[in-house]
Structures are given as structure tokens and as C-alpha cells.
Design a protein with these regions (language model features):
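Bacterial Sec-dependent N-terminal signal peptides
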Residues: 1, 5-38, 124, 130-151, ...
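Surface-exposed or flexible loop/turn and strand-edge residues in extracellular/cell-surface modules
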Residues: 11, 38, 52-54, 122, ...
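Tryptophan-anchored aromatic micro-motifs
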Residues: 25-49, 139-197, 217-219
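Generic short beta-strand segments
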Residues: 38-43, 69-71, 95-106, 155-164, ...
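N-terminal glycine/threonine-rich, aromatic-flanked beta-hairpin/loop signature
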Residues: 50-81, 166-290
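A short, structured loop/turn motif at beta-sheet edges
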Residues: 60-62, 85-92, 128, 272-273, ...
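Central antiparallel beta-sheet cores of small beta-barrel/beta-sandwich binding domains
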Residues: 64-105
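Beta-sheet ligand-binding and adhesion/scaffold domains
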Residues: 95-148, 262, 277-279, 286-420
Length: 420
């Protein structure tokens, strides 16, 4: 019995020593805001360094919370419970995760709640008594919000002839129907816009990837500013014949000298799918760091110019605010390795209706340019190109579009992709 008592006493002593070693004096852990700008907070999100933002740990005897402010793209503030452990004298390690039901936004001021979980955030790191912290954070689109879209999608480049011998599908496709006397115009526009739009996008865009961590990357071609004024409206039938290959199919290929640029996986844009919509959310803060100075103030200035032209800002402004909240929104259809991202008449109506009042004013501006002998050669070339496009689309002047849209029954503009 004495021997058993001694063994029990020793086990109890070892257990107490272990408990004491595991205990953390939470009062020693810095609780102040630690900023990335100061250099005392070294933070990465999906391995991309964060230059602006802060981290803060709040701890008590029961729990600890990590706050990340302006760190996770699309979110002003993210809080998560963390486990704290001693990592040596004056140093503690931590890890935690949280699920976000709020949708990311282009401007974090507009972030809104949504259900169900959209993003899952994980973090780990260390903090020292000297007020220095490292945070390694990762994001993941929830399984539900991935909706089977994760992966690389290539632009549709090959299409078989349809029943009318036209392509059965286009890389960029416009489907348009209208009532009465405008029916034929809408049908012709469907073909012309699909063809011209597809030829343009085929030479500018190659693929996009929806990554599991929420990043959107793409292969694209930089816009070439040279030769913009040399536009000549091609003949539709000539173009269609040129697209038919030896296999009898239509091929929308990029130009022979096209060099694709890869948009890096650098938290520049994020994505998720929810309730039948695919959202692509540009990270304006990251774009600004990479030299793009576009901001909300620039947008408001542009709205002022549009108002002067006659655009109905009362209709347009809510649409812009919606975009700031949710990013770029598309309906989508995914089936058998094909993905269609599209906007229909319901989605386009508010934006188009906002611009309709400006078209008569645009008539006057173009007429004044045409009668002005002092405009530059570049302006003359641009005016000629615009007139050629309008003529090909069946318009004498911009305001001819107004009654067409007012009599439109259905409208759909799509980007067609295939799984890589």
C-alpha cells in the first residue's frame, strides 16, 4: 500500500507540473492593434503578403479571439476564435478558423450578409510580448458556394453548324427577339453581334480558372491601342466562310501572333456561386497597390459626366451600388463540361434604360462632329468607324436603338466556356 500511494503521489505531481506548464498567462499577451504598415505585423493571405491592415488578439482566462481588419480581401473585419499555446519565453502560437456567411464585396463598406456559408477562413501564427505578430491566413470557397464550378474553363472555340448553317454556338453569343416590325432587326443583330463579339473575344481571352481558395485567374491578351482608327466593317458572309475548317465546323481561333498573359493568383479577384448566380468580385484595394488608381471617387466623377450627357443617374446609381456590394454578377448554366455565364433582359434592363435618355443627345453630338471641319484626323477615323458599325447593325443614328429595346421580348448575352 505505501508503494501504491507513492506511485499515485508521483503521478499526481507530474500531472500538476504538466498543467502548470500548459497554462498561459493571458495578461502577458499584447492586446493592442498591430499594423502591417508598421512592420510589426507580418501577414499573408493565400501566400500573398498583406501591405495594409492590422491584426489584434483579445484573450482572457476562457478564450481568445483574433481580429483581422482589412486583411481578408472583400471583408472589412474578420474575427475568429483561436487556440493559444506557449511557444517559449515571451512567445505564443495560435491557430483558428471561421466560416463567413457575409458575401465579399468590391468596397468593404458595402459587405452584406448572405446564407449559407460562402467562405471558410483559417489562420495560424505567433505573437510575442514585444508586440510583433505573424499571421498566415488562407481562404476557401465553401463546398456549397463552389457549385461544381471549381477548375479551369477554356473559351469555346469550335462549333458545329446549326439547322440554319450558322454556328450552333459562339464564344460570345447574343440571343435577341423583338416584337412586330423590330423582329427582323433583333434577329439580324443576334447574328452580327455574336459574330463580331466572338471574333474580338477569341483574340483577347483564352481561359479562366475558379480556384478553390476563391481566387480567379485568367489568360488574356493586353489591349492593343494601335490601329483603332483603321476599323473596316467586314462582310458577315465572308467572315463566316473564313471560319469554316476542313472538318466542316466553325473555328474561332486567336490570331497567329497572340501572346497570352496570365493573371497571377494574387488575390486580385475572388468568386463564389450562390442561388443560381456566379459572382466575380474584383479586389479594388489590391488593384490600387498594383497601379490601378480607380476608386469610388473616380466612379462618382464619371457619373457626373454621364448625367450631363443625359443618362438617368437615379436608375444607374442603385445598379452601381449593387455591383459594389456583390461584384460582377452573372447567371450561369453548367452541364456536361460546358459553362455559360450570361446576363438576360431582366439583368440588363435597368442599365440600358438608364442610358436610353442620353441617345438623342448623342445624335446631336455626332452630327456636330460630322459637320465640324476642324476635328482631328483621329476623331474623323473614330466617327467613320462608329458610323460603319451602326450601319451594319441597322441604325442610322444612336436613338434608333430606343424603340428597338422598348419592343424587345427576350435578350441574352453569354460567354461560352468548356472544361479544360
Amino acid at each position: 500500500m505505501p508503494l501504491c500511494a507513492l506511485v499515485c503521489a508521483l503521478e499526481f505531481s507530474v500531472s500538476c507540473d504538466k498543467d502548470n506548464a500548459d497554462k498561459i498567462d493571458w495578461k502577458e499577451i499584447p492586446s493592442e492593434i498591430i499594423t502591417a504598415e508598421s512592420g510589426n505585423a507580418v501577414i499573408t493571405v493565400n501566400e500573398v503578403p498583406v501591405k495594409i491592415g492590422y491584426a489584434k488578439i483579445s484573450a482572457n482566462s476562457d478564450n481568445a479571439t483574433l481580429t483581422l481588419n482589412n486583411v481578408i480581401p472583400g471583408y472589412r473585419k474578420v474575427e475568429m476564435g483561436i487556440d493559444l499555446k506557449s511557444a517559449g519565453e515571451g512567445e505564443w502560437s495560435f491557430s483558428g478558423q471561421t466560416s463567413l456567411t457575409a458575401s465579399p464585396s468590391m468596397v468593404t463598406l458595402f459587405s452584406v450578409e448572405a446564407r449559407p456559408t460562402i467562405y471558410e477562413i483559417s489562420s495560424e501564427g505567433k505573437i510575442t510580448s514585444e508586440g510583433k505578430i505573424t499571421v498566415v491566413a488562407t481562404t476557401k470557397v465553401s463546398e456549397g458556394a463552389q457549385a461544381g464550378l471549381t477548375g479551369t474553363w477554356n473559351l469555346l472555340r469550335t462549333a458545329a453548324p446549326g439547322a440554319n448553317l450558322l454556328p450552333s454556338a459562339y464564344p460570345m453569343q447574343v440571343t435577341w427577339t423583338a416584337d412586330g416590325e423590330y423582329a427582323a432587326t433583333a434577329e439580324n443583330l443576334s447574328v452580327a453581334l455574336s459574330l463580331m463579339g466572338s471574333l474580338d473575344i477569341a483574340d483577347r481571352f483564352n481561359s479562366m480558372t475558379f480556384h478553390e481558395d476563391g481566387n480567379v485567374t485568367a489568360e488574356y491578351k493586353e489591349e492593343d491601342s494601335e490601329g483603332k482608327g483603321d476599323f473596316q466593317m467586314p462582310d458577315v458572309q465572308t467572315l463566316l466562310k473564313a471560319l469554316i475548317g476542313p472538318d466542316g465546323k466553325y473555328h474561332f481561333n486567336a490570331g497567329p501572333n497572340t501572346e497570352w498573359i496570365s493573371l497571377p493568383k494574387a488575390n486580385l479577384a475572388f468568386w463564389y456561386a450562390l442561388q443560381g448566380y456566379c459572382y466575380i468580385v474584383p479586389n479594388l484595394a489590391a488593384s490600387a497597390e498594383n497601379g490601378d488608381d480607380t476608386n469610388v471617387l473616380d466612379i462618382m466623377k464619371s457619373l457626373g459626366s454621364l448625367k450631363d450627357l443625359g443618362v438617368d443617374i437615379s436608375i444607374l446609381l442603385p445598379q452601381i451600388q449593387e455591383m459594389m456590394k456583390y461584384g460582377l454578377r452573372f447567371k450561369y448554366s453548367e452541364e456536361d463540361g460546358s459553362l455559360e455565364l450570361y446576363a438576360d433582359k431582366e439583368m440588363c434592363d435597368p442599365v440600358v434604360n438608364a442610358f436610353l435618355p442620353a441617345l438623342p443627345n448623342l445624335d446631336k453630338i455626332l452630327a456636330e462632329m460630322e459637320s465640324n471641319p476642324d476635328i482631328s484626323a483621329e476623331e474623323k477615323a473614330e466617327l467613320l468607324a462608329l458610323k460603319q458599325v451602326m450601319k451594319a447593325l441597322g441604325f442610322e443614328k444612336p436613338s434608333d436603338f430606343v424603340p428597338l429595346w422598348q419592343n424587345t421580348l427576350t435578350f441574352r448575352i453569354s460567354i461560352n466556356l468548356v472544361k479544360a
